[in-house]
Curated annotation (Swiss-Prot):
Location of region: Coil 2: 252-390
Pfam families: Filament, Keratin_2_head
Organism name: Mus musculus (Mouse)
Name listed for the protein in its UniProt record: Keratin, type II cytoskeletal 80
SUPFAM superfamilies for the chain: Intermediate filament protein, coiled coil region
Segments for region (Coil 1B): 136-227
Region (Tail): 391-452
UniProt modified residues of type Phosphoserine: S45
TM stretches of this protein: none
Comp. bias (Polar residues): 443-452
Site (Stutter): G334
Subunit record text: Heterotetramer of two type I and two type II keratins.
Length: 452
């Protein structure tokens, strides 16, 4: 049979236009005109329908309240025709309600399917925490290895620094010894120079004494010549004077012998003194020469050792530079690895946070879906009650006027029942919402504890 199009609005659902086939017309996408779900079904399409109208009021003719007149009246036939029209309207409304109930059942099935899909997706997302923990453990193991390598490098650096300190102390000791030896060498050189000067002075004195000795010899010879000449003169005089018989030759010989003895003694003393001084100076010069030679040998040995120490210091410095470069490279690599680990840790934390946010969003969507499902269940129950009331009203055999009165009363009762069911719906909405919120908070707290 053909039905008329009607507009019925309830809660957040819009009116549905019925086709002659008795099924609602689907929209182009989503829930178009509150019909069947299209291919673009989403959580937003649940609230995309706007109410197109409200349930029309059932008007009661006041003349029906007048006591019945059993006489045949033309108004009775008119009243029956009016009741037939009302029955047709109610049948159309009933057919629209049946189509809406079917659409709501399909919508409920879609919501259940989506809820199961979201639960599977949430469990899969939650299972990724094991992979995150494994990757985090591997990064921590790498960080521990890098820390151990850094500790070993620091220990090697301390050993190298100790060796460098030991070589530095030895180098300072050698420098101090070299300084002492150089000071000793300078002192010995000063003593050698002083001895050379003294030797030169002694040689000069020896030459002066030899010159003085020659001079004294010349003087003595000249005096001897003078005395000889005087003796000759005296002898001549004596020869002339025959009265004096003085023997001057003996005196001259005696004086000459005395002078010769004095000159010989002076020469011997001078030669002995000069020889002793020369021997002493030669001994001291030989001693200083030996000490100088030993000092030169020691200086040569020290120079060789200094060269060796310098080469060792250069090699140690180069080794220290290489170790410092290796330490810098190791520190840079450790810092890069640590920074990479921190970045990966931050990425994992961001991914975990994003997963938590996705889980919370899915929980909120689930909560919204459950609220929508609850509202739809309440609407379905209300429609079932309305249909049961309509069926019970249609099944009761009674007179035309009484049925009309009863239908009006039932319509009023259905309105009151609708009001009661809507109030119950508002009351019952809070219970599951609170339960879902508590469940989501409990799940988020467990997830945060597991991540910690």
């Amino acid at each position: 049979m053909a039905y008329r199009s009607c507009v019925v609005g309830f809660s957040s659902l819009s009116g549905c236009e019925m086709t002659p086939a008795g099924s609602p017309q689907p929209g182009t996408s989503g829930w178009g005109s509150c019909g069947l779900p299209g291919p673009g079904f989403s959580s937003r399409s649940l609230t995309s329908c706007r109410p197109a109208g409200t349930i029309p009021k059932v008007t009661v003719n006041p003349s029906l309240l007048v006591p019945l007149d059993l006489k045949v009246d033309p108004a009775v036939q008119q009243q029956k025709n009016q009741e037939k029209e009302e029955m047709k309207a109610l049948n159309d409304k009933f057919a629209s309600l049946i189509g809406k109930v079917q659409a709501l059942e399909q919508r409920n099935q879609l919501l259940e399917t989506r809820w199961s899909f979201l639960q599977g997706q949430g469990s899969a997302t939650f299972d990724l925490s094991h992979h995150y923990e494994t990757f985090q453990g591997r990064l921590q193991e790498e960080l521990r290895k890098v820390s151990q390598e850094r500790g070993q490098l620091e220990a090697n650096l301390l050993q190298v620094l100790e060796k460098v300190e030991e070589f530095r102390v030895r180098y300072e000791d050698e420098i101090s010894k070299r300084t002492d030896l150089e000071f000793t060498f300078v002192q010995l050189k000063k003593d050698l120079d002083a001895e050379c000067l003294r030797r030169t002075e002694l040689e000069t004195k020896l030459k002066g004494l030899q010159g003085f000795l020659e001079l004294m010899r010349t003087v003595y010879e000249q005096e001897l010549k003078d005395l000889t000449a005087q003796v000759k003169d005296v002898s001549v005089t004596v020869g002339l004077d025959s009265r004096c018989h003085i023997d001057l030759s003996g005196i001259v010989e005696e004086v000459k012998a005395q002078y010769d003895a004095i000159a010989a003694r002076s020469l011997e003393e001078a030669e002995a003194y000069s020889r002793s001084q020369l021997e002493e100076r030669a001994a001291r010069s030989a001693e200083f020469g030996n000490s100088l030679q030993s000092s030169r040998c020691e200086i040569a040995d020290l120079n060789v050792r200094i060269q060796k120490l310098r080469s060792q210091i250069v090699s140690v410095k180069s080794h220290c530079l290489k170790l410092e470069e290796n330490i810098k490279v190791a520190e840079e690599q450790g810092e890069l690895a640590f920074q990479d680990a921190k970045d990966k840790m931050a990425q994992l934390e961001n991914a975990l946070q994003k997963a938590k946010q996705d889980m919370a969003r899915q929980l909120r969507e689930y909560q919204d879906l459950m609220n929508t499902k609850l509202a739809l269940d309440i609407e379905i129950a209300t429609y079932h009650k309305l249909m049961e009331g309509e069926e019970s009203r249609m099944d009761l055999p009674s007179a035309t006027v009484v049925s009309t009165v009863k239908s009006g009363c039932r319509t009023t009762a259905s309105k009151s029942g609708l009001t009661k069911t809507s109030s119950r719906k508002k009351k019952n909405r809070r219970g599951p919402v609170i339960k879902i919120t508590e469940m989501s908070e409990k799940y988020l707290s467990q997830e945060s504890e597991a991540s910690e």
